[in-house]
């Protein structure tokens, strides 16, 4: 495969409702799309970096620079045997996994299209449907939170995740468990706590959560190991895991019992598969986290989630949960049973709506 050209586009997509976490509120997503021309095949990837360096040090601006000034010169015109090689070819760039993933995942889309295979099959996926959960941001009232959960359950979602932060943790969990005693419920702290808050987090053991996601520092595997030894509830690591070696360290130190895999955070499909395989060998279940992706990023998540050890419902939701109108056709839909069908068309299995993308584009740069 030879990369002939890439087109970088920044689009703006407005969320149907604001999404609040422990580090801020989003109502508009700045999304960086990569369209790659690989041997004449048009292939797509998405960068999940945000506008601000709060979830990660990466932003839309840093990713644009890395893709334009470093990734493109490294890859252009080079003979590349397989998409799985791109991760290693970009290894001289330290970090910047979200930028790398944007171009790396496009290569996977291209290879799948060239081989006339669904991306899920090229990756080694075994599922024809994936179980879906939903992520609900911090709500201003408990009543509002309960209403959001009722809405998600009515739509068929199999697992409910709520965002928490210091002062908005035990009370909302208690209220939800009282109202919904048997639902699969988890919380996500996005690093809002410190090890000194262990007693507060231990209080959540009483509510039979399936996991507490990333309670402590975004790069602190050691403290998570100390915390996990005090909790009955499994810890799931998110922000701490950037590659297979971070996953290995977390497993060997018993810092978690579950790992969240996000394509952007780990640098693309090849890295995600390595983490998946390591976790599978160590009986650590994984699931796919979400970053408020457009349909292109969501399509890549669906393909990845078809791998065997993605055994817990992920954050891959319907397009209409977040966007009035997505940028792919057909849009992602969730069945009444709370699953998404893995597409069987070649590549990511969804067609980018070029007219819609063009209308949303704020800036564009063609590199050839």
Show where each model-derived region lies.
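Flexible C-terminal active-site loop/helix
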Residues: 2-15, 26, 31, 39, ...
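Shared catalytic-loop signature of beta/alpha-barrel
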Residues: 71, 208, 219-236, 241-339
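Metal-dependent enolase-superfamily TIM-barrel catalytic cores that perform enediolate-based chemistry
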Residues: 121-231
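Hydrophobic faces of well-ordered beta-strands that scaffold small-molecule active sites
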Residues: 45, 132-136, 160-162, 185-189, ...
């Amino acid at each position: 495969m030879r990369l002939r050209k890439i087109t970088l586009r920044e689009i703006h997509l407005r969320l149907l409702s604001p999404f609040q976490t422990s580090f801020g509120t989003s109502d508009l997503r700045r999304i960086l799309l990569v369209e790659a021309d690989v041997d004449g095949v048009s292939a797509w990837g998405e960068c999940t970096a945000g506008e601000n360096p709060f979830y990660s040090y990466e932003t839309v601006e840093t990713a644009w620079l890395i893709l334009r000034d470093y990734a493109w010169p490294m890859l252009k015109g080079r003979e590349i045997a397989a998409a799985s090689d791109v991760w290693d070819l970009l290894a001289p760039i330290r970090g910047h996994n979200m930028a790398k993933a944007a171009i790396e995942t496009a290569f996977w889309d291209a290879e799948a299209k060239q081989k006339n295979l669904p991306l899920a099959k090229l990756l080694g996926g075994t599922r024809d449907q994936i179980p879906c959960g939903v992520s609900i941001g911090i709500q201003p009232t408990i009543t509002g939170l309960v209403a959001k959960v009722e809405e998600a359950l009515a739509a068929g979602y199999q697992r409910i995740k709520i965002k928490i932060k210091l002062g908005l943790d035990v009370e909302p969990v208690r209220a939800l468990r009282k109202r919904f005693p048997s639902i699969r419920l988890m919380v996500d702290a996005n690093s809002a706590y410190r090890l000194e808050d262990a007693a507060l987090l231990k209080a959540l053991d009483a509510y039979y959560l399936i996991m507490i996601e990333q309670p402590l520092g975004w790069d602190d595997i050691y403290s998570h190991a100390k915390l996990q030894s005090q909790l009955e509830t499994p810890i799931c690591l998110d922000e701490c895991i950037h590659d297979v070696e971070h996953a290995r360290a977390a497993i060997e130190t018993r810092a978690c019992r579950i790992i969240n895999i996000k394509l952007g955070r780990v640098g693309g499909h090849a890295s995600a598969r390595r983490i998946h395989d390591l976790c599978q060998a160590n009986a650590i279940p994984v699931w796919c986290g979400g970053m408020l992706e457009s349909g292109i990023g969501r399509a890549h998540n669906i393909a990845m989630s078809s791998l065997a050890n993605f055994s817990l419902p992920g954050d891959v939701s319907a397009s209409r949960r977040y966007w009035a109108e997505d940028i792919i056709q057909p849009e992602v839909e969730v069945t009444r049973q709370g699953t998404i069908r893995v597409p069987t068309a070649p590549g990511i299995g969804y067609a980018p709506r070029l007219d819609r993308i063009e209308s949303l584009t704020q800036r564009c740069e063609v590199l050839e």
